[in-house]
Amino acid sequence: MQFTKMSAFATLALATLAAATPTRRNDSPSNQCNTGSLQCCNSLQSANSASLAGLLGLLGVVVGTITGQVGVTCSPITGVGVSGTSCSEQPVCCTNNAFNGVIALGCSPININL
């Protein structure tokens, strides 16, 4: 009988300890892109947008090859949370920013947790 009580107490104590053990949290900002670079664009448009067609044509971009959205007037975001670095528009991850900030291709909106 004594062994049963001791066994039950040990089981209960271990269960309580396991439930109270702190776990590591990852509170770092999600400021990394899985692919491409983090950008701040003045607008984000569909690749087949009529208002964007002329600009894409001037830059020689074939609309059918674009996946994702197109960011217009983009600048890189570096050092998220650093004083002076801000993005008043939707931050995006873009896979092709080879157009000197005029446009960025393959953009997906992201959430930056500060």
From Swiss-Prot:
MF terms in GO: structural constituent of cell wall
Gene induction: Expression is induced under conditions of inorganic phosphate (Pi) deficiency.
Compartment list: Secreted; Secreted, Cell wall
Main location: secreted
Pfam families in the cross-refs: Hydrophobin
Keywords (A to Z) from UniProt: Cell wall, Disulfide bond, Secreted, Signal
Domain of life: Eukaryota
GO CC annotations on file: extracellular region; fungal-type cell wall
CDD domains found in the cross-reference section: hydrophobin_I (cd23507)
Leader sequence segment: 1-20
Disulphide bonds in the chain: 33-93, 40-87, 41-74, 94-107
Function: Aerial growth, conidiation, and dispersal of filamentous fungi in the environment rely upon a capability of their secreting small amphipathic proteins called hydrophobins (HPBs) with low sequence identity. Class I can self-assemble into an outermost layer of rodlet bundles on aerial cell surfaces, conferring cellular hydrophobicity that supports fungal growth, development and dispersal; whereas Class II form highly ordered films at water-air interfaces through intermolecular interactions but contribute nothing to the rodlet structure.
Assembly with partners or alone: Self-assembles to form functional amyloid fibrils called rodlets. Self-assembly into fibrillar rodlets occurs spontaneously at hydrophobic:hydrophilic interfaces and the rodlets further associate laterally to form amphipathic monolayers.
Similarity-based family: Belongs to the fungal hydrophobin family.
Protein name: Class I hydrophobin 1
Source organism (scientific name): Pholiota nameko
